């Protein structure tokens, strides 16, 4: 940081001469308004910034160059120049918080100031030139779907490939690319999906995960090599992906403030602090992108309410802008924005490039002409080939000269991309045989062109002007160095110093906590509740030997609760990982800075939880009540919490996928619990697993807690042997305390002796253990911090199709065998042209007319009624394609939902009729609704998804064969033959965007809708060619008798010509126009022109012209109230007359047989169930990750437990160990439960969002099938779980003396099956009514903890406070433990181990039998030396039944307990169905108030 950077200096003066004023604001007017004034906030004001500085310097670079070239004379300006950062109030146009703010003037002013001091503000620009750029990857164009049967084979193939024993298939993605984009220029990248647009951007920006550059690539950034730019100057060339990754809990203002502060330079304008800089830059960018009104709104995501999707996209744009990179690659960043906001975004880029010299490379879909005209250059890609690069204006002429024709009113961008589509390009007459046909031919024509020769000449000249490692590199380095904090190293790509990064990340961490306190509060409240419950169970422990086991149990439970308090941090870290990796690529901060800051930010919450939990536990249970011992207890507990937090963070950081983190973690946690030293003492551990205890931090903590509690302490004996009648006068060495460590004749037992005899613990180990725990803490802290810097998340694969095994198409197999790069490329296959008859002829022609009149829709917002739709009229007739258009927020989708009977709240009034009759229960299943989101079951193939819809939604009277045959017709009609057997999958591994949209349409057509088809934004987010293909498909459907109503967002003129009628809505849901469009939309244009609108230019897009006419386009205004004009027009009178005519005539017409079915569903419930159950089984079979994870949980932990307690002896400790083996088996429960929930949620989401509204099948069929599908897998997995657990432990040996080995083995097998069935049905019950799997998992975990505490293992029912006995009886695990333990060890003699034998002296003159015989008759036990007279050896428990009675287990009740467990399973099933009905099934027909407008009547129902 420069010494003067914080000093207040005189503001520079000077102004531009009038004749030299930059006038670009006239060309690109980019001004925003802000409804919120940003005052000085309590942000940290330390040395933290660079992101915004980079941007300012970018601006400075351009102007200083202009000034040197004579473009600006800023040295001799007499008038004072305002510093916008300090004095913007004096000029509203420079104040981002003012409605008059002008971005162009602001930029000009900043550059005017910075250009006066080129030494303080050295400029930095980065154009890019590239030649011989070839990029390839490895993989296949198709893959076969994994399922339970073929996963091992697939895994083996993967291992072979990793070892290099199987040759990879090379896929060429980009071939021989060359280009030049100078600083200050904008390049638009055009091409169809799969043509390589994203790869081009990723390569230029250094995002090359999974990509490989060929030898000989020549990519230079204005004198800087590709390698040097992406190593030493990371963040100077950045890639902005399509996806939005932000912290949802943070406000928009804080999100952007963070980005501004992280890149705030050291060489800011004089007198401007980092805080002032960051706040002002944030306000400027928010104003520029019309985000000012969202400054205090949370960003949100799909689960957390926040800003809209379009606003979230603009936040990503703002964040990238604030990074201030001289070269920015934008990958489809306008996706999700309407055309107005997309245009504003591109204009803002133009301003940045013009004034600051930045370079923008933008891949954009559906670019309107106004957007395209802003760009300087264009590049056109065709399946990995470059077929044009050059001047954007020249591009159109280049292809016309080649022989292609551009239709009137087609935008240049659409024309250029249509050239790459054989079915859409138009050839001029006479050129049919002369134009290129294949991508290679296009590329060859480009290489032979004069345009390419000129380009290569320009590249040569450019590279000579900026030679590698020349003066430009030094300037670039000097510019970056000027921005960096003084303590930042020269080679670092980051602007801030490391401590500044940590401080800034801590600020953000606390803002995130403040934005969502629910997790912290839930954790504190949950821990208070759990501590109170546990403390009450172990309440006020007596200082006698009776408390030995319960004190151990308590400390065991306490240390586990402390240790695993941070286990969910794995999920938290994974959710934020994409954000941190993105910011690292932007060079905002080190990932390790975020790692350290997150530890520090979490510390107060951890400390609060630890204090509350441990205070309650310690003092309510009467643990050793001295200050010193409490603080030792707290110190070890809290240190263990921190250590285990680092352990879980390290696991998350070193894993490249979430499953890599979660599966080992569950087994890892099980190992830590078992080898803590309580469930199996150190001396009893088997040698092959004993090493685990040495690397287990919890084991050291538990030992120290036990030493802290028992060391140097005497416990009064609670029970003597012998005692009772006849032994009242026994004293001295003739009696002994019934506890380990007891000495004959001594009334107390030493805590130290007890620890030594039972656990092999020694007091000298306590502080040694603390040192070991701290060492673990430091080691895992180092691993965590190092891993965050070195390990990145696994990138997604390239776009490939996936097929079931054996169904990969022949053409893809051939490409794989021949290793033909072009055949194997990720190209998008064209729809197959079908020969013969038109496949759409198979569509059933619709005959009904759907018409509506005076439709209004009102909802209540903050107790005030708001009208969303206002007296909308219209109709849809068979064979017509009707467009529903309007400005953003006009209510287009809402009208579609109201008409389709899909709204769930509010008041709907008006008439909606089918052939003059009211809609009935069957209306929803008789209509098709193509939703905007393409929601399908990922594991289904295209054909299966279509068949599922046809089987369930076509009438029951239609034969099965006819339904299946119709599906084949739909596949041919939609051109889906090549991928009919392809799996839906996910984007990247499955269908691409267009294929998904076609499937969404196909699913609705396969249902043979009797009435009409609704389409909601079918072209949103698609490229122009895909949008065109979807519109032509809708046109084809309409031409064959379908009635189609489609919402569409500002389409091109070409798309609009496909529609017959238009319903146009203004804001507030008011009608602006309803009627015919006419040829070339002449009818529509005539209507508006006749009502006073300006003439529509011949080359204009009527859709955009119409928006300008009504004042809805950016910058447009109108004095005409167009909804009022429509309301009073003759056209509306004619619409009303025709509606009345339809109502009277059609109501008299008899209904066709297909329309007389009034049932809610097409199929009976039992058929629904069979079809849905079949799909559910199919889903599980094709989800090998889930099944094999489930199998791992059934095999690995049980095997681990089995060999941990291998061949346990029938001693007192052995029986207790066997009881703990059962206890450990139950710990699998939460993992099994949480594992199932996400799969249920996926199915339920699909059902509730798409299948339930369309009345595909009943919720009853869905719930029953989702519960039943688990049963066969549970039965199958019972086999390995039984053998891996039952036999290694040696339960079968206990049954040998009773001759009941077979019976007991069968009973144990049944009990394990019951356990697995209980787990799955309990999971179904918990998640049935809950939205998120995480919430369900937390509830299940809480229930599990309670049932585990009260099942009688850790605390016997006799030691339990009377209040909690009801929980003991309520816990299902009580009956499971009872049944398993009695089956496993019942009716067996106990053989005491040497350290369990009690030794005492008999009374004088008596043998041991004579002395202890009476005692054994009423108290039990076995005399091992009956004839001895000097020393008796006595085993306190003779048989296992006596041991079982001590924990309230009776052998003869095991079958009763099994019956009770079946009752719990049945309860879970009924509960799952009941909770789903209660919480998620709409209770009334429509869930809305409905009424008929003329009568103004509404039947009220609650949503």
Swiss-Prot record:
Region Disordered: start-end pairs: 1-46, 816-838
Domain ABC transporter residue range list: 153-408, 850-1093
GO annotation, biological process: xenobiotic detoxification by transmembrane export across the plasma membrane
InterPro entries found in the cross-reference section: AAA+_ATPase, ABC2_TM, ABC_trans_N, ABC_transporter-like_ATP-bd, ABC_transporter-like_CS, ABCG_dom, ABCG_PDR_1, ABCG_PDR_2
Residues binding ATP: 886-893
Keyword Phosphoprotein attributed: no
Protein name as catalogued: ABC multidrug transporter MDR3
Native source species: Trichophyton rubrum (strain ATCC MYA-4607 / CBS 118892) (Athlete's foot fungus)
Gene name of this polypeptide: MDR3
């Amino acid at each position: 940081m420069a010494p003067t950077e914080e000093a207040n200096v005189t503001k520079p003066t000077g102004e531009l001469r009038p004749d030299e004023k930059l006038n670009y604001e006239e060309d690109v007017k980019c001004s925003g308004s802000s409804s919120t004034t940003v005052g000085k906030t309590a942000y940290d004001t330390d040395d933290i910034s660079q992101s915004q500085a980079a941007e300012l310097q970018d601006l400075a670079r351009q102007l200083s160059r202009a000034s040197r070239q004579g473009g600006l004379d800023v040295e001799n300006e007499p008038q004072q120049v305002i510093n916008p950062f300090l004095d913007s109030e004096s000029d509203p146009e420079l104040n981002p918080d003012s409605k008059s703010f002008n971005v162009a003037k602001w930029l000009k002013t900043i550059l005017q100031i910075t250009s006066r001091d080129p030494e303080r503000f050295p400029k930095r620009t980065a154009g890019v030139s590239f030649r011989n750029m070839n990029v390839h990857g490895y993989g296949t164009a198709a893959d076969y779907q994994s399922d339970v049967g073929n996963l091992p084979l697939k895994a083996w193939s993967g291992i072979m490939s990793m070892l290099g024993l199987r040759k990879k298939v090379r896929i060429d993605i980009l071939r021989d690319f060359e280009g030049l984009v100078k600083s200050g220029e904008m390049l638009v990248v055009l091409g169809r999906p799969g043509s390589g647009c994203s790869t081009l951007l990723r390569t230029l920006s250094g995002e090359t995960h999974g990509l490989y550059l060929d030898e000989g690539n020549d990519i230079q950034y204005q004198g800087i090599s590709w390698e040097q730019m992406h190593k030493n100057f990371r963040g100077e060339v950045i890639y902005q992906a399509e996806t939005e990754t932000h912290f949802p809990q943070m406000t928009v203002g804080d999100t952007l403030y963070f980005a501004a502060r992280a890149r705030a330079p050291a060489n800011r304008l004089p007198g401007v602090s980092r805080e002032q800089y960051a706040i002002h830059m944030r306000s400027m960018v928010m104003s520029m992108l019309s985000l000012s009104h969202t400054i205090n709104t949370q960003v949100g995501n799909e689960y957390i309410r926040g800003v809209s999707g379009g606003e979230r996209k603009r936040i990503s744009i703002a964040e990238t802008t604030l990074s201030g990179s001289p070269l920015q690659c934008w990958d489809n960043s306008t996706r999700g924005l309407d055309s107005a906001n997309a245009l504003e975004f591109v204009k803002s880029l133009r301003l940045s490039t013009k004034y600051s010299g930045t370079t923008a490379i933008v891949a954009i879909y559906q670019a309107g002409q106004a957007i395209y005209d802003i760009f300087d250059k264009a590049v056109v890609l065709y399946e990995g080939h470059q077929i044009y690069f050059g001047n954007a204006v020249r591009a159109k002429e280049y292809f016309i000269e080649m022989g292609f024709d551009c239709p009137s009113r087609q935008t240049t961008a659409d024309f250029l991309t249509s050239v790459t589509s054989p079915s859409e390009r138009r050839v001029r007459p006479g050129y049919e045989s002369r134009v290129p046909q294949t991508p290679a031919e296009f590329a060859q024509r480009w290489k032979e062109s004069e345009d390419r020769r000129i380009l290569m000449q320009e590249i040569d000249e450019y590279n000579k002007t900026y030679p590698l490692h020349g003066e430009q590199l030094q300037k670039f380095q000097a510019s970056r160095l000027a921005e960096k904090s003084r303590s930042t190293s020269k080679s670092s790509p980051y602007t801030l110093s490391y401590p500044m990064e940590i401080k800034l990340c801590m600020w953000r961490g606390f803002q995130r906590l403040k934005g969502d306190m629910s997790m912290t509060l839930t954790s504190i409240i949950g821990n208070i509740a759990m501590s109170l419950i546990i403390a009450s169970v172990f309440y006020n422990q007596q200082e006698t030997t009776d408390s030995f086991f319960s004190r151990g149990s308590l400390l065991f439970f306490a240390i586990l609760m402390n240790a695993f308090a941070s286990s969910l941090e794995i999920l938290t870290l994974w959710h934020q990982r994409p954000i941190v990796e993105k910011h690292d690529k932007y060079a905002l901060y080190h990932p390790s800075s975020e790692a350290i800051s997150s530890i520090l930010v979490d510390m107060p919450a951890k400390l609060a939880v630890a204090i509350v939990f441990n205070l309650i536990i310690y003092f309510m249970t009467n643990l050793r009540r001295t200050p010193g011992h409490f603080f030792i207890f707290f110190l070890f507990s809290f240190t263990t919490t921190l250590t285990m937090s680092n352990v879980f963070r390290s696991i998350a950081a070193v894993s490249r996928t979430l499953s890599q983190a979660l599966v080992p973690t569950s087994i890892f946690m099980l190992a830590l619990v078992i080898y803590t030293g309580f469930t199996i003492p150190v001396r009893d551990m088997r040698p092959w697993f004993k090493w685990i205890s040495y690397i287990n931090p919890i084991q050291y903590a538990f030992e120290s807690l036990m030493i802290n509690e028992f060391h140097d302490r005497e416990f009064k004996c609670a029970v003597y042997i012998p005692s009772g009648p006849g032994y009242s006068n026994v004293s001295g060495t003739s009696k002994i305390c019934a506890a380990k460590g007891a000495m004959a004749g001594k009334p107390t037992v030493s805590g130290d002796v007890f620890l030594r005899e039972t656990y092999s613990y020694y007091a000298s180990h306590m502080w040694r253990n603390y040192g070991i725990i701290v060492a673990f803490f430091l080691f895992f802290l180092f691993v965590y911090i190092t891993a965050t810097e070195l390990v990145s998340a696994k990138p997604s694969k390239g776009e490939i199709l996936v097929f079931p095994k054996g169904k990969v198409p022949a053409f893809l197999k051939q490409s794989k065998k021949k290793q033909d790069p072009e055949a194997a490329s990720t190209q998008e296959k064209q729809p197959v042209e079908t020969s013969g008859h038109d496949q759409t002829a198979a569509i059933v022609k619709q005959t009904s007319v759907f018409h509506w009149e005076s439709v209004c829709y009102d909802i209540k917002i903050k107790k005030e009624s708001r009208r969303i739709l206002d007296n909308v009229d219209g109709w849809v007739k068979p064979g017509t394609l009707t467009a529903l258009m309007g400005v953003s927020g006009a209510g287009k989708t809402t009208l579609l939902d109201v008409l389709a009977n899909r709204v769930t709240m509010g008041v709907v009034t008006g008439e909606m009729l089918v052939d003059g009759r009211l809609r009935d229960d069957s209306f929803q299943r008789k209509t098709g609704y193509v939703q905007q989101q393409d929601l399908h079951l990922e594991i289904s193939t295209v054909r299966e998804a279509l068949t599922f819809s046809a089987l369930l939604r076509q009438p029951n009277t239609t034969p099965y064969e006819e339904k299946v045959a119709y599906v084949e017709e739909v596949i041919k009609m939609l051109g889906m033959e090549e991928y009919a057997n392809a799996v839906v999958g996910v984007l990247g591994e499955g269908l691409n965007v267009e294929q998904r949209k076609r499937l969404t349409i196909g699913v609705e057509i396969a249902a043979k809708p009797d009435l009409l088809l609704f389409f909601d934004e079918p072209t949103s987010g698609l490229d122009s060619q895909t949008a065109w293909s979807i519109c032509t498909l809708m046109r084809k459907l309409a031409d064959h008798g379908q009635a189609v109503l489609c919402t569409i967002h500002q389409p091109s003129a070409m798309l609009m010509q496909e529609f017959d009628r238009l319903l146009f809505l203004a804001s507030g849901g008011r009608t602006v126009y309803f009627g015919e469009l006419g040829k070339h939309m002449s009818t529509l244009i005539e209507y508006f022109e006749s009502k006073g609108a300006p003439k529509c230019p011949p080359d204009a897009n009527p859709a955009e012209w119409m928006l300008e006419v009504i004042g809805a386009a950016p910058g447009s205004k109108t004095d005409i109230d167009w909804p009022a004009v429509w309301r009073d027009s003759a056209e509306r009178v004619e619409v009303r007359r025709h509606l009345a005519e339809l109502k009277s005539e059609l109501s008299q017409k008899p209904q066709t047989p297909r329309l007389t079915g009034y049932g809610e569903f097409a199929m009976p419930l039992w058929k629904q169930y069979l079809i849905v159950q079949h799909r559910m089984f199919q889903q599980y079979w094709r989800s090998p990750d889930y099944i094999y994870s489930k199998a791992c949980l059934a095999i690995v932990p049980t095997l681990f437990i089995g060999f941990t307690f291998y061949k346990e002896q029938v001693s007192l400790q052995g029986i207790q160990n066997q009881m703990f083996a059962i206890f450990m088996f139950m710990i699998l429960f939460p993992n099994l439960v949480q594992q199932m929930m996400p799969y249920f949620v996926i199915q339920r989401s699909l059902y509730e969002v798409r299948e339930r509204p369309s009345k595909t099948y009943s919720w009853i069929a869905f719930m029953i099938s989702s519960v039943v599908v688990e049963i066969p897998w549970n039965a199958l997995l019972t086999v390995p779980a039984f053998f891996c657990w039952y036999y290694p432990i040696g339960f079968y040996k206990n049954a040998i003396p009773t001759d009941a080995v077979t019976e007991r083995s069968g009973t144990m097998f049944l009990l394990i099956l019951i356990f697995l069935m209980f787990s799955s049905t309990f999971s179904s019950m918990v998640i049935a009514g809950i939205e998120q799997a995480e919430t369900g998992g937390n509830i299940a975990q809480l229930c599990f903890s309670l049932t585990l505490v009260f099942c009688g293992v850790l605390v016997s029912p006799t030691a339990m406070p009377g209040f909690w006995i009801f929980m003991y009886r309520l816990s299902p695990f009580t009956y499971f433990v009872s049944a398993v333990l009695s089956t496993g060890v019942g009716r067996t003699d106990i053989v005491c181990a040497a350290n369990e034998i009690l030794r005492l002296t008999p009374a004088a003159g008596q043998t041991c039998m004579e002395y202890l015989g009476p005692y054994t008759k009423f108290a039990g036990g076995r005399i091992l030396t009956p004839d001895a007279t000097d020393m008796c050896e006595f085993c306190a428990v003779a048989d296992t039944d006596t041991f079982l009675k001590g924990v309230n287990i009776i052998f003869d009740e095991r079958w009763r307990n099994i019956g009770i467990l079946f009752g719990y399973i049945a309860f879970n099933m009924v509960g799952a169905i009941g909770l789903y009905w209660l919480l998620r099934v709409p209770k009334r027909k429509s869930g809305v108030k409905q009424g008929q407008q003329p009568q103004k009547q509404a039947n009220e129902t609650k949503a």
